[in-house]
Amino acid sequence: MNSSFSAPAKKSLGQHFLADRYYIDRIVQAVDPRPGQHLVEIGPGQGAITFPLLRKHGALTVIEFDRDLIAPLTDAAAPIGQLQIIHRDVLAVDFTAVADGTPIRLVGNLPYNISSPILFHALDHAGAVADMHFMLQKEVVDRMAAGPGSKVYGRLSVMLQAYCEVTALFVVPPGAFRPPPKVDSAVVRLVPRDAASVLIKDRKRFADVVRAGFGQRRKTLRNALSTVCEPAHFEAAGVRPDARAEQLEVADFIRLANVELA
């Protein structure tokens, strides 16, 4: 039984609604909601994932910016379970406040045009998030999960992997959506690391080092990081200044950012 409804996709909001039952079921299986958990879906759209999750779990919070979807979501959810709708831009939502002491599980088919800002916003509230299951452009998921030496290993890879375990789960083809996007999508799982295992002393300093390193990725670190690191930083961290950012492990960036010179 599918309770999703029909509504026109808005290009301005980057909307592509998932419509293929096979992939909907795979996402719900990947999330595997359990009693007592607090599920929060970002951008429910026509309810393709919303209603199967609600039917399985009984309660769900959704964050939807498109006001034209609020009433249809409310009406369709009424006979299924308890649906709480937060009508707001997701980047303005305080996930820590939404969690209210119970870590939330974030789920969503993220709008292509703001997927990276949403990921970094979720990281800002990592202490209130148990895990995340997101569908994004496959290209973005490839970057998120990439390792050193890969052509797509970059700032997004390092920033996310420093704070989360990142696992690419499966690819979703364009034909699974209405309207179909021009590229493949993929589902990814992110599990925030325990705070004690994230050894970053200064989050801003770490972000600055990573940004500078990949901002000029063809240059050696000595040149790319000239505004944020001195030669002594490399020596103390055990990082070669003649290496390039794409050659460094996440742990190398953390050590480099953590160095405090006297």
Swiss-Prot record:
Its EC number is 2.1.1.182. Its main location: cytoplasm. One of its GO terms (cellular component) is cytosol. Pfam families: RrnaAD. It is found in: Cytoplasm. One of its GO terms (biological process) is rRNA methylation. It is an enzyme of class 2 (transferase). GO terms for molecular function: 16S rRNA (adenine(1518)-N(6)/adenine(1519)-N(6))-dimethyltransferase activity; RNA binding; rRNA (adenine-N6,N6-)-dimethyltransferase activity. S-adenosyl-L-methionine binds at H16, L18, G43, E64, D89, N109. Keywords: Cytoplasm, Methyltransferase, RNA-binding, rRNA processing, S-adenosyl-L-methionine, Transferase. It catalyses: adenosine(1518)/adenosine(1519) in 16S rRNA + 4 S-adenosyl-L-methionine = N(6)-dimethyladenosine(1518)/N(6)-dimethyladenosine(1519) in 16S rRNA + 4 S-adenosyl-L-homocysteine + 4 H(+). InterPro entries: KsgA/Erm (IPR001737), rRNA_Ade_diMease-like_C (IPR023165), rRNA_Ade_Mease_Trfase_CS (IPR020596), rRNA_Ade_methylase_Trfase_N (IPR020598), rRNA_adenine_dimethylase (IPR011530), SAM-dependent_MTases_sf (IPR029063). Specifically dimethylates two adjacent adenosines (A1518 and A1519) in the loop of a conserved hairpin near the 3'-end of 16S rRNA in the 30S particle. May play a critical role in biogenesis of 30S subunits. Belongs to the class I-like SAM-binding methyltransferase superfamily. rRNA adenine N(6)-methyltransferase family. RsmA subfamily. NCBIfam families: ksgA. This is Ribosomal RNA small subunit methyltransferase A.
